[in-house]
Amino acid sequence: MAPPLLTLSNIHLTFGSTPLFEGAELTIMPNERLCIVGRNGSGKSTLLKIAAGMVDHDDGKRWVKPGITMRYLPQEPDLSQFKTSREYIEDGLVGADDSYRIPYLLNGLSLTGDEDPQVMSGGELRRAALARTLAPKPDILMLDEPTNHLDLAAIEWLENEIKSLSSSVIIISHDRRFLENLSKRTLWVDRGETKLLEKNFSFFEDWRDRTLEQEKLDRHKLKRKIHREQHWVIHGVSGRRKRNVKRLKDLSTLRTQFKTQRQSTGNLNITVADSHQSGRFISKLVSITKSFGDKKVFDDFSIKITRGERIGIVGPNGSGKTTLLKIIMGEVLPDKGRVELGVNLLPLIIDQKRESLNDEWTLSEALTDNGGDKVMVGDNSIHVIRYMRDFLFLPEQAKTPLHALSGGERGRLQLARGLRLPSNLLVLDEPTNDLDLETLDLLQELVADYDGTVIVVSHDRDFLDRTVTRTIAYENNSKWQIYPGGY
């Protein structure tokens, strides 16, 4: 068996007073395709940065096979020092790296190389960073959320490119289909530890649930054993002194073990404010046409959306998905055609831009608005700590300033704030960006149980397949087609 390329052994790391890792392990083998999964804030990105040598650890050992090359894709690439995307990509080449791949990668990722970083979109910045990371064909390729801001065509191209590489590839992603198509092994980062599944991600969730159930059973057995020993201390201390001293010491050890176990934070339990029912139809578009300058976005498109439907909208970046959404909502008028809106609509829009919040607010203040300890969900008053727990926040995070939250935690906060308000039309514009897999599970349940109409714009194939009943898909040349079901 070939030796590993990189290992992390017994890694410990603490931020402030909170331990992030307590004995984390990672092994990268030749021809590896490993996915790293875990909840937001569990330390996935930090573990990847430790492996890349970008973050120091407090204790433990990092070993890298001499002479290997590594490349790391950051979540937020910085192109501010470069005049063009090509200049940024070429700057990533070193030594014997050959620049022949750059035109191929630019073409595959729909870039010209002449893009100005100052005006590039999030998707263009991400594609440029991918090209820079992929260009050298490194021995180890580390990708942190590579599908964020990519459209479906770019995601599928990236899957095929990764499959063609001989590099060992480590992936952090919330895109289930992407992980299922690429991973060979799965590393779960959970409460400071790492657990390895020697199988593809498609087996992970069943394995995780069984592991947590067994852990719950083991903890219950430990609690019962402590109870029996405590009973002995009260009623049965007699006989040989040495035996008694040892048994008392064992009881102390059991208590410490029980106390220091980090329990699972549970599952999301999303509460949605009640609202009045909308009319029978939500929005009707009749033969609409829309252009921006010389670019025609829609040409003779019609659809009628009725109450209770789950509508998905898919298409390449720049094809007009958000414009279509705004036309459906009556926020943008078509150049030709007719738009009719239903009655009694109460829309709730959760979009990829994230609402602007005061970063100095605490999490509690952002949820209560008035700084009290109650959250108003429709007409119901819920204690802020309970409401936080429903969205996987810990009670001790109540006083955490918003600037200290991760991208995924801010996404959960946006959901928590939005769902306080009554609505009967839920609009999700790229809702899966930055959310962890558990949050996506519950967002899917929310869409399924929502007592109203849902419209989703997304590049997440698995999310669409699990949630929508009809899909509006971009075909080509301003033509859009309606299909039953998901992607």
Where are these regions (language model features)?
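Intracellular alpha-helical coupling/juxtamembrane segments of multi-pass membrane proteins
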Residues: W207-R240, N244-L248, L254-Q261
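Alpha-helical coupling/stalk and coiled-coil linker elements that connect catalytic or binding modules
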Residues: E229-S238, S252-T253, L268-S275, I282-K284
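ABC ATP-binding cassette signature C-motif
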Residues: M1-R219, I270-Y487
